Amino acid sequence: DQLSGGQKQRVGIARALIQNPKMLLCDEPIASLDPNSAKIIMDHLKNISSTLGITCIVNLHQVDVALKYSDRIIGINNGKKVYDGPPKEITEDIVRNIYGSEVKNLIL
């Protein structure tokens, strides 16, 4: 096992793209990655979406990453949708509704 976590993620994305998908479902694609590898993965997903027209549904817990890379955010708390809209409309109240915590208590 000589591949890093980021390399494994890129291989996984490449394997999925070979199938010519209309959509990629990415569950925590940057979990356990260093910041540089996380940026590379998110840049790849954004490029795949914008260049190839493939919808990428990405499950993230990093609010800052979601705000930077998303065109649309769906926030869920206790299995219920509490937000569905563009990142630019996310407010501190919405973050509190999603995470049940004040924004100042979160790493953003």
Segments the model singles out, each with a brief description of its role:
Residues 35-37:
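Helix N-cap at the start of a conserved alpha-helix in ABC-type nucleotide-binding domains
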Residues 24-27:
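Catalytic Walker B motif of ABC-type/P-loop ATPase nucleotide-binding domains
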Residues 1-3, 7:
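Conserved ABC ATPase signature
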Residues 60-61:
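H-loop/switch region of ABC-family ATPase nucleotide-binding domains
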Residues 39-51:
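Helical segment within the ABC ATPase nucleotide-binding domain
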Residues 20:
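Conserved catalytic motifs of ABC-family nucleotide-binding domains
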